[in-house]
Design a protein with these regions (language model features):
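Short, cationic-aromatic polyanion-contact patches
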Residues: 6-17, 31, 64-87
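Short, locally clustered residues in the helix-turn-helix/winged-helix DNA-binding domain
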Residues: 14, 23-27
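The DNA-contacting recognition helix of HTH DNA-binding domains
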Residues: 18, 43-44
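A short acidic, leucine-rich amphipathic alpha-helix
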Residues: 21, 34-38, 53
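Glycine-centered, phosphate/nucleic-acid-interacting loop/turn motifs that mediate DNA/RNA or nucleotide
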Residues: 57, 63
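Amphipathic alpha-helical dimerization/coiled-coil segments
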Residues: 81-115
């Protein structure tokens, strides 16, 4: 998939629900069901927003867990560190700085330290 367009990023930045989800996913990974429950948004809306944010490469799927009923549950975390939007010469440009990739062991250790 190509890089997200500046217009798509601006659309995301002006959507309160998407911003709330991004803030929620900044420090820890959650499933879509957990996002919907904790943020008190309809599950269908959470799925749509999470799907769009993943397509825009704003959040990242971190793991998939197979549940006892045989269904898979995906977990997500914020994938961006910084977004820069510029408007110059009647043109919009966008730069996204992704978070540094951390080894799963490092993330696991950080999870234990914060609990």
């Amino acid at each position: 998939m190509s890089a997200p367009s500046p217009e798509d990023i601006l659309s995301f930045l002006t959507d309160n629900t998407s911003l709330t989800i991004l803030k929620f996913l900044d420090e820890k990974e959650y499933s879509t069901q957990q996002i919907a429950s904790n943020l008190e948004i309809p599950l269908s809306s959470a799925y749509r927003k999470v799907n769009k944010l993943e397509q825009l490469k704003i959040i990242k799927k971190t793991k998939i867990i197979r549940k006892m009923d045989g269904t898979d549950e995906s977990f997500y975390t914020s994938w961006i560190d910084e977004v820069q939007i510029n408007f110059k010469n009647n043109r919009i440009t966008c730069k996204i700085k992704n978070k540094e990739h951390q080894d799963k062991i490092v993330r696991l250790w950080q999870g234990f330290r914060h609990n």
